[in-house]
């Protein structure tokens, strides 16, 4: 009888461990910023006997917008400010909406006005945002504040790009010399984001719907800001290893289970293996947008009353 030896069963290969990006906690940053704003609101009230007031106008009954607007009102109250909600039916005419904005412009208790976008078909968002007094345009979307930003002059900066910039500086510090790639060229995010990053000394490239090879462009970015509204557009291999990724997108998708979840424009599970740091969705840019709205409202109130002391 001969001895038989059996070959050892090969061991399971060890799982490949990928580096994981740092999460940029916009929720925590926004909470700290809101606490600071609340203290500043109290100091402002103690000195000037004025409580900053924010008017938010929602036209139509889009459920996502309704939730967002109510959250804005809640955060406004938490910061010690007054909130004025105006919920209008989708049948509201342009003339009716402009008349309301005119009344809000003239109301001394209101220091900031925000019209929730998008508006229903038939309403002109450019005319509506430009009807808001520049000093009360706390979303920074009117032509006066947009022009000031383009020229590098003081003005009200759009909330979402401002929040993105705060998060980037908190993670990276000095941004000078970095190549920032922005995917998305909207007036709401992409264009003002580009101007803010230029002012910080970045080399800025903006990709848009007609960009021929957006993946190749994205891979050049030390900073990658994505704001397209197309969930999962940016795959992991679009990202330069170690880049800072800011995902502005937010979309609610349906799962096979029948449940829903919020996702961004970046394929998060792929991105975390390549990025150096990244904002999650939710909990990244969204909370910062609201915190910056409160910050802009307080700043608007200070300008309107002629406050000269440091904020």
UniProtKB/Swiss-Prot annotation:
<dbReference type="Pfam" id="PF02882">
    <property type="entry name" value="THF_DHG_CYH_C"/>
</dbReference>
<dbReference type="InterPro" id="IPR020867">
    <property type="entry name" value="THF_DH/CycHdrlase_CS"/>
</dbReference>
<keyword id="KW-0554">One-carbon metabolism</keyword>
<keyword id="KW-0368">Histidine biosynthesis</keyword>
<feature type="binding site">
    <location>
        <begin position="184"/>
        <end position="186"/>
    </location>
    <ligand>
        <name>NADP(+)</name>
    </ligand>
</feature>
<feature type="binding site">
    <location>
        <position position="250"/>
    </location>
    <ligand>
        <name>NADP(+)</name>
    </ligand>
</feature>
<comment type="subunit">
    <text>Homodimer.</text>
</comment>
<comment type="pathway">
    <text>One-carbon metabolism; tetrahydrofolate interconversion.</text>
</comment>
<dbReference type="GO" id="GO:0000105">
    <property type="term" value="P:L-histidine biosynthetic process"/>
</dbReference>
<dbReference type="InterPro" id="IPR000672">
    <property type="entry name" value="THF_DH/CycHdrlase"/>
</dbReference>
<dbReference type="InterPro" id="IPR036291">
    <property type="entry name" value="NAD(P)-bd_dom_sf"/>
</dbReference>
<dbReference type="GO" id="GO:0009086">
    <property type="term" value="P:methionine biosynthetic process"/>
</dbReference>
<dbReference type="Pfam" id="PF00763">
    <property type="entry name" value="THF_DHG_CYH"/>
</dbReference>
<dbReference type="GO" id="GO:0005829">
    <property type="term" value="C:cytosol"/>
</dbReference>
<keyword id="KW-0560">Oxidoreductase</keyword>
<keyword id="KW-0521">NADP</keyword>
<dbReference type="InterPro" id="IPR020631">
    <property type="entry name" value="THF_DH/CycHdrlase_NAD-bd_dom"/>
</dbReference>
<dbReference type="GO" id="GO:0004488">
    <property type="term" value="F:methylenetetrahydrofolate dehydrogenase (NADP+) activity"/>
</dbReference>
<comment type="similarity">
    <text>Belongs to the tetrahydrofolate dehydrogenase/cyclohydrolase family.</text>
</comment>
<keyword id="KW-0511">Multifunctional enzyme</keyword>
<feature type="binding site">
    <location>
        <position position="209"/>
    </location>
    <ligand>
        <name>NADP(+)</name>
    </ligand>
</feature>
<comment type="function">
    <text>Catalyzes the oxidation of 5,10-methylenetetrahydrofolate to 5,10-methenyltetrahydrofolate and then the hydrolysis of 5,10-methenyltetrahydrofolate to 10-formyltetrahydrofolate.</text>
</comment>
<protein>
    <recommendedName>
        <fullName>Bifunctional protein FolD</fullName>
        <ecNumber>1.5.1.5</ecNumber>
        <ecNumber>3.5.4.9</ecNumber>
    </recommendedName>
</protein>
<keyword id="KW-0486">Methionine biosynthesis</keyword>
<dbReference type="InterPro" id="IPR020630">
    <property type="entry name" value="THF_DH/CycHdrlase_cat_dom"/>
</dbReference>
<dbReference type="InterPro" id="IPR046346">
    <property type="entry name" value="Aminoacid_DH-like_N_sf"/>
</dbReference>
<dbReference type="GO" id="GO:0006164">
    <property type="term" value="P:purine nucleotide biosynthetic process"/>
</dbReference>
<keyword id="KW-0028">Amino-acid biosynthesis</keyword>
<dbReference type="GO" id="GO:0004477">
    <property type="term" value="F:methenyltetrahydrofolate cyclohydrolase activity"/>
</dbReference>
<keyword id="KW-0378">Hydrolase</keyword>
<keyword id="KW-0658">Purine biosynthesis</keyword>
<dbReference type="GO" id="GO:0035999">
    <property type="term" value="P:tetrahydrofolate interconversion"/>
</dbReference>
């Amino acid at each position: 009888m001969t001895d038989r030896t059996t070959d050892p069963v090969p061991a399971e290969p060890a799982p490949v461990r990928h580096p994981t990006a740092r999460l940029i906690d916009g929720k925590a940053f926004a909470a700290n910023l809101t606490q600071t704003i609340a203290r500043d609101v109290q100091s402002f009230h103690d000195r000037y006997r004025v409580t900053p007031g924010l008017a938010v106008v929602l036209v139509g009954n889009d459920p996502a917008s309704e939730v967002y607007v109510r959250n804005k009102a809640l955060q406004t109250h938490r910061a010690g400010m007054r909130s004025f909600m105006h919920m209008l039916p989708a049948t509201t005419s342009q003339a009716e909406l402009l008349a309301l904005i005119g009344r809000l412009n003239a109301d001394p208790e209101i220091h900031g006005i925000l019209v929730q976008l998008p508006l229903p078909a038939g309403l002109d968002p450019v005319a509506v945002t430009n009807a808001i007094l520049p000093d009360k345009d706390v979303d920074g979307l009117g032509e006066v504040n947009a022009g000031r930003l383009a020229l590098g002059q003081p003005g009200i900066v759009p909330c979402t790009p401002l929040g993105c910039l705060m998060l980037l500086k908190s993670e990276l510090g000095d941004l000078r010399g970095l190549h920032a790639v922005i995917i998305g060229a909207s007036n709401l995010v992409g264009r003002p984001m580009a101007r803010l990053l230029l002012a910080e000394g970045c080399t800025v490239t903006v990709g848009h719907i007609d960009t021929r090879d957006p993946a190749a462009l994205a891979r050049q970015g030390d900073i990658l800001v994505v704001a397209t509204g197309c969930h999962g557009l940016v795959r992991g291999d679009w990202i330069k290893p170690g880049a800072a990724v800011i995902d502005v997108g937010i979309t609610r998708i349906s799962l096979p289970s029948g449940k829903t979840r919020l996702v961004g424009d970046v394929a998060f599970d792929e991105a975390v293996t390549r990025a150096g740091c990244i904002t999650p969705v939710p909990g990244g840019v969204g909370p910062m947008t609201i915190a910056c709205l409160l910050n802009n409202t307080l700043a608007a109130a200070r300008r309107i009353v002629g406050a000269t002391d440091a904020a």
